[in-house]
Every structure is written in C-alpha cells, then in structure tokens.
Amino acid sequence: MKYLMQVRFNGADAVIHELPADEQMRITAEFQAIRKTPGVLDGNQLEAVATAKTVRVNDGETLVSDGPTVADGAELNGYYVYDAPDLDAAIAFASRIPVARMGGTVEVRALMER
C-alpha cells in the first residue's frame, strides 16, 4: 500500500538554522538517508509558504488567493510517498522523519489504489 506522508512544521527552516552546525549536518544526513530508504517512491521539501497560492472555483469563476490553505495552522513543508507493507510500517517510517521529534507532525494517509 502506498502512503502519503505530509510533513508539517511551522518555521522549520528558521528552527533548523538556529541549531549548532553539527546538529544541522546530522539532520541533513537523516533526511538524505530517509530519501534512500527502500520503498520511498518520491519526496521533497516545498518552497516557502509565502510562495503558495490557493485556488477555488465558485460559480465558474476561478479565485486565487495568496498563501496556503491551513486548516490547523501547521505549514506543509514537504512530503514523501512510501510503499509500505502495512500501516504500522508506514507509521514506523514517519517516526524517522526528524521533524516529527522537533515539534512538527507527519500525517500518514493511504493513497487510494485504482
């Protein structure tokens, strides 16, 4: 089953840049190792939240607003698509993402298979 991991953390770049250089290097190495994990099909960091646009269509009119759609206040910083044998394996993978232990969250959601 394929799972989407939505990585959310307000101010992630600022928090990481405030860490000592050796800690920044360790976290960077962790992210690189995660990208190389068997089963990772895709993943990337997103550009700054200030570059986001939100698109809605009302009565045939396209409305575009600046900024992200933020339901819970947490910024979407990146994502992974992970092919896991089951939900427990997907959760174990998500727990390895450094943001999960730094005050951010990783939402795990199965992709619909068609």
Task: Annotate each language-model stretch with its function.
Residues M1-R114:
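Conserved, structured core segments of small domains
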